[in-house]
From Swiss-Prot:
InterPro entries in the record: Leu-rich_rpt, Leu-rich_rpt_typical-subtyp, LRR_dom_sf, LRR_domain-containing, PPM-type-like_dom_sf, PPM-type_phosphatase-like_dom, RA_PHLPP-like
SUPFAM superfamilies in UniProt: L domain-like, PP2C-like, RNI-like
Record's catalysed reaction(s): O-phospho-L-seryl-[protein] + H2O = L-seryl-[protein] + phosphate; O-phospho-L-threonyl-[protein] + H2O = L-threonyl-[protein] + phosphate
Keywords of this entry: Hydrolase, Leucine-rich repeat, Manganese, Metal-binding, Protein phosphatase, Repeat
A Gene Ontology BP annotation from the UniProt entry: intracellular signal transduction
Originating species: Caenorhabditis elegans
Name of the protein described by the UniProt record: Protein phosphatase PHLPP-like protein
Biological classification of the source: Eukaryota, Metazoa, Ecdysozoa, Nematoda, Chromadorea
Length: 1126
């Protein structure tokens, strides 16, 4: 094409064939090197041939995701392709064409001619010649030098040196020309009398080269050493459409060649053999090749010329579009490894059986309906047959095969196998299998049968070492004889009520997983095992742990969310190797006695959400190796002990949602303490932590701390100080000594009243967990919220966060679906290989809008129930798997798409289009009186917590901030150590109002009989489990009020305190509490007053006292949340 023409058109768009019927648009076209571009105007009738004619090029090439190139046919309309592409991007789960989706489509089409769109979708004029970030150096180096050949005196000559491929050509002034083959020579630096020189020598001769520009020496040395030392060429991810010349000329004698993830093709049938070299077929010229990786290119047929490479040992042709294998493949006699996975094969030639040296053949993720007959004649160790259409295995008899991978096939309901030598069998994700009988496979060691419909599993135990049968319908397991060699048994997510008793007799069992069943007990002798190291039996119905009287080797015991009421006596003494114990969400009131006299290795202790009191504190402080303690949601009145300071390794302490009135001063003496959580207690002050050098997070929100008078000395490395929902305003001037540190500390102080948005109160909680990176971020701009989950990539989430914040500020009323797509388009180069889950929520006065793609989920509270409205895609179901396969993707053993990606719905991952799409879910919810709120969070919240748990937490706590924090506490109490982020929106109920009466109104306008029913109607208490006692004249000073628990109603609070009896007067006051018949679980509180005209002053004083005392007894935060209109 004409470069001058391209440069001239880049300044102003040109018009190419005015539209006839359809609307014209601008297209951006790139030069073949990708360095320049121009815009043209065209319509759907404009063809590639017409564009080529105008720009004097032979072809238009399309690139998606800055990855594969595709040459377009001459009669193709580029604009039509672009519109179809954008239409796919704007698709929603509903696939409905609405006015909003049309607007989103129009918006993204208007963005397509932006240079930033290059990373997603681009057209090139001619055949692309992109210079990628290459390890294959194609630069030609040329320098004026002085050279000396050999060791003779006075032989220095002026010359010009040219370095290209693996050669250095020396051109002297007398027109002598000599080429040096670098790969056959040793390269180093030599200190000569004339200066530093590049020395090249072999067995016969030595060359010294001194550069006139001395600083050039290092560049030439590096380049020469790269050429010299390796016969391995890595040209992967180079955006190659042709193989570079320096590879094909075989000067390097390349043995290992990596051409993965390019756009290489075989020579088209119409291409003449005299055409330029560079096709896959031309690799036969490189006779030295032993290993070739051509995976993830655009090969349509098996390159038959490769069968001429007599030294070839390994050939990888996976993730191409090959539909047949030629019989000539039998010529590759030395071939040991052949990977043909993720192609379009349905048969293999019988001649493959002649490859007697073949050790590995991978034909997974093709279209085989039966096992190719040639496999029965090969001496392979493993059959890799995952992702095909195989229904059964017909062939029986003795065979050498030992391992078979049959994942994601269509195997029949009853599975049997008669190949006796099998040692490893993988049947995962065959959704029709209900029965597996393999008692005849006496050599079977490892079996994977997860995610089937298994109701019956029978195995031989003679050689069995590992059994994985999670996510099935099993209530029993038959293994005969006793599996003496069994090491791992995983049976989670089944229907077991009791585990087999023979488990206790397995002498080598080290790992047992049986969570998410219906277990009522563990095997009686399970703790007598001397080999068992880990037991995971959480989310069951276990009521007790069997007694055991001798020490064992157990290191991990996870039993959260069961029905335990106690632990065995001497539990900690006879488990000396226990390092992690989780008994959260049980009914335990007291930990068993432990005096510290015996050695205890326990490092992680999680006892959240039980009935523990301060009586268990002496037990805990005797465990000197503890690093994490979680005692949240218990009944602790204090956490103090004289030995508390001996927990020198403690890093994380959670005391939230207890009854604490103070924190022990000795907590500041713990040298390793990093995180302290004590929210939702009754604390009135924060102790001195100035000397805690490691402490970076303190959460004392939702307490009774008076922030206006708080004298807080901040530790030097404090980053987060959360004082939300306390009284007063926190003033950092109270600790001026730490002024230099304040710029690093994030003080969080959000009053609930300030977080009011169209009748919703807002609660937010987030944590990095045990990770150093924050990969989940949240954005709020006015009435719009954004959630970004970058998976394991913190840079991606922060990049999207910055863009979304700035974009929302400029386009606050833009449709949230269009915003989501703009985030997709703005990822740029990072979006080619990386992606993120994004959810956007917009709150209106009368409706809620939610748009989401990825793993974020949301549930709405309506009529005392929580219902999922957007469910993030955690697992790949059958329908989604079919779509992925149609898009030429595959799924690995861990259900990761193309071996990397966790979800097929994300923004980003441009290079995997159309396997991964930004397809979104959209909900438009009309607000009414039945809707109570919304919970939004990342996927692990919904994976680990049940909808019932979340519903209970939401409806048993009136503060959305407390709800968010308790959800986070519960998540961490279940051993989740990753990032979490939670948003809670809660509808505000009408304020409780006490209508008192001024003197004038009492005397002149209102009578008590009229006022009393009015008070009854307006005062509604939204705390269902709280019952106020009757008022008595002189009650004692009350003890701390217990925190409200979601498991059982809290005991009633003590009587309202009063320091002196009320004055005797003609006014009488009575507080009556009666259950409301109109509100579910609510109570109506009425204050009945009888006034006389002579007691105005005393009645006002009495009213003020009653108001303050009632607010304090109700634990309202801040105390003046209840308003009194006097």
């Amino acid at each position: 094409m004409n470069n001058e023409q391209l440069q001239s058109t880049s300044s102003s768009p040109s018009t190419l064939l005015k539209p006839i019927e359809k609307k014209s648009r601008f297209l951006r076209l790139y030069s073949s090197d990708g360095q320049r571009s121009t815009r043209i105007e065209c319509d759907e009738h404009t063809t590639c041939a017409q564009i080529c004619q105008q720009f004097s090029c032979d072809v238009i090439t399309l690139q998606i995701g800055n990855y594969h190139f595709r040459q377009l046919k001459s009669d193709t309309s580029p604009l039509a392709i672009l519109q179809d592409f954008c239409r796919i991007l704007t698709m929603s789960d509903e696939n409905l064409e609405t006015e909003s989706t049309s607007k989103a489509l129009e918006d993204i089409l208007s963005y397509t001619d932006s240079p930033a769109f290059r990373h997603i979708f681009s057209f090139f004029l001619g055949r692309p010649r992109i210079r990628a970030k290459s390890t294959l150096n194609l630069d030609i180096l040329s320098e004026e030098v002085v050279i000396r050949k050999g060791k003779l005196i006075h032989t220095w000559q002026n010359a010009r040196a040219v370095f290209y491929n693996s050669n250095i050509r020396l051109q002297t002034k007398n027109n002598q020309d000599e080429a040096l083959q670098i790969r056959n020579m040793k390269v180093d630096v030599h200190e000569s009398k004339r200066g530093r020189a590049l020395r090249l020598k072999d067995d016969d001769v030595c060359y010294l080269i001194i550069f006139q520009r001395p600083n050039i020496l290092e560049a030439w040395l590096t380049r020469a050493q790269q050429v010299e030392k390796s016969n391995h060429v890595d040209a992967s991810d180079e955006q190659l459409t042709l193989i570079p010349e320096q590879i094909l000329n075989n000067e390097a004698r390349v043995q290992i060649l990596n051409l993965r993830r390019n756009s290489l093709i075989s020579r088209p049938p119409t291409e003449k053999s005299m055409a330029p070299l560079g096709y896959i077929d031309d690799l036969y010229r490189v006779h030295s090749l032993q290993v070739i990786d051509l995976s993830a290119n655009q090969i349509l047929s098996f390159p038959i010329q490769l069968t001429l490479l007599s030294h070839l040992r390994q050939l990888n042709l996976s993730s191409n579009y090959i539909s047949s294998v030629p019989s000539e493949c039998s010529n590759m006699r030395r071939l040991q490894y052949l990977n043909l996975s993720n192609n379009q094969l349905d048969t293999l030639p019988d001649s493959i059986s002649e490859l007697q040296n073949l050790q590995s053949l991978d034909i997974s993720f093709n279209q085989f309906s039966q096992i190719p007959p040639c496999l029965f004649h090969l001496t392979l160790e493993m059959w890799r047959l995952a992702g095909n259409n195989i229904e059964k295995i017909d062939r029986v008899g003795e065979m050498q095969i030992q391992k078979i991978d049959l994942r994601r096939n269509v195997l029949d309901t009853s599975f049997r196998l008669d190949i006796e030598n099998i040692t490893h069998l993988d049947l995962r994700d065959n959704s029709m299998i209900s029965t597996v009988h393999l008692t005849n496979l006496r050599f079977l060691k490892v079996i994977h049968c997860e995610r089937l419909q298994l109701s019956s599993l029978h195995l031989s135990g003679e050689s069995l070492t590992h059994v994985y049968a999670d996510h099935n319908l099993l209530d029993s397991l038959v293994v005969m004889p006793l599996p003496q060699n069994l090491q791992t048994l995983s049976l989670s997510f089944n229907h077991f009520r009791n585990l087999p008793d023979w488990i206790s007799d397995c002498p080598n069992l080290t790992f047992l997983r049986a969570n998410n069943n219906s277990l009522v007990a563990l095997p009686e002798r399970i703790f007598y095992s001397q080999s068992l190291r880990s037991i995971f039996a959480f989310i069951n119905e276990i009521e007790h742990i069997p007694d055991f009287g001798e020490e064992n080797c157990l290191e991990t015991l996870i039993l959260y969310k069961n029905k335990l009421s106690s632990l065995p006596k001497h539990f900690f003494s006879i488990l000396p190797r226990l390092r992690q114990l989780n008994i959260s969400s049980n009914f335990i009131e007291l930990l068993p006695y432990f005096d510290g006299s015996s050695f205890c290795r326990l490092q992680i202790l999680r006892c959240a959400n039980n009935y523990l009191t301060e009586n268990s504190v002496p037990v805990i402080v005797n465990m000197k190796h503890l690093k994490i303690i979680d005692l949240s949601h218990n009944r602790l009145n204090s956490f103090d002990d004289s030995a508390l300071s001996s927990l020198e390794l403690l890093e994380d302490l959670n005391l939230s949602s207890n009854r604490l009135t103070r924190l022990a001063d000795c907590l500041a003496l713990l040298p390793c303490l990093q995180v302290l959580r004590a929210h939702s207690n009754q604390l009135v002050h924060v102790p001195e932590f100035r000397a805690s050098n490691q402490l970076h997070t303190i959460d004392v929100s939702s307490n009774n701390i008076s922030l206006g008078t708080l004298q807080f000395k901040a530790p030097p490395n404090l980053r987060h100080f959360d004082v939300t929902c306390n009284s007063g305003d926190f003033d950092t001037e109270n600790f001026p000594e730490n002024a230099k540190m304040h710029s690093k500390m994030n003080t969080i102080n959000i009053s609930e009243g300030s977080q009011n948005l169209f009748g919703f109160q807002i609660g937010v909680s987030g944590s990095r967990g045990m990770k150093n990176k924050q990969c989940i971020r949240q954005v709020r701009v006015e009435n719009t919220f954004g959630f970004i989950d970058g998976g394991s990539n913190s840079y991606m989430s922060s990049s999207i966060c910055r863009f979304m914040t700035s974009y929302l500020k400029e386009n606050v009323s833009m449709d949230i679906r269009s915003i989501l797509l703009r985030c997709h388009c703005e990822l740029g180069e990072e979006g080619e290989r990386l992606g993120a889950s994004v959810m956007i929520i917009r709150v209106h006065e009368k409706r809620l809008e939610i748009a989401s793609t990825g793993t974020m989920s949301a549930a709405i509270a309506r009529n005392q129930k929580l219902k999922m409205i957007i469910n993030g895609r955690y697992e790949i179901d059958d329908d989604e798997y079919s779509r992925i396969r149609e898009a030429h993707g595959f799924v690995d053993e861990e259900n990761r798409i193309n071996g990397v990606i966790g979800s097929s719905r994300q923004i980003g991952h441009f290079s995997t289009f159309p396997v991964v799409l930004p397809t979104h879910s959209y909900r438009n919810i009309q607000l009414n009186e039945q809707i109570e709120g919304l919970i939004v969070g990342n996927n692990m919240i919904w994976n680990m917590l049940s909808i019932d748990d979340l519903n209970s937490t939401f409806h048993n706590n009136r503060s959305p901030i407390v709800v968010a924090k308790k959800i986070q506490d519960q998540l961490q109490s279940y051993d989740y150590g990753g990032n979490s982020n939670i948003l809670v929106l809660r509808r505000i109920k009408p304020q409780m109002t006490f209508n008192g009466f001024s003197t004038s109104s009492t005397k002149n306008q209102v009578t008590p009989d009229i006022a009393i029913p009015k008070i009854d109607e307006q005062l509604v208490l939204a705390v269902p489990a709280l019952i106020l006692p009757e008022y008595h004249p002189s009650p004692p000073v009350p003890p701390p009020i217990p925190a409200i628990r979601h498991r059982t109603p809290s005991p009633p609070p003590p009587p309202l305190p009063s320091s002196t009896p009320p004055p005797v007067s003609s006014e009488h006051e009575e507080i009556n509490v009666r259950q409301s018949s109109t509100l579910s679980g609510g109570y109506t509180l009425s204050i009945d007053r009888f006034y006389s005209s002579s007691s105005t002053v005393s009645s006002r004083k009495q009213f003020n006292e009653t108001r303050d005392l009632l607010s304090k007894s109700l634990k309202l935060s801040p105390p003046n949340t209840v308003t009194f209109n006097i």
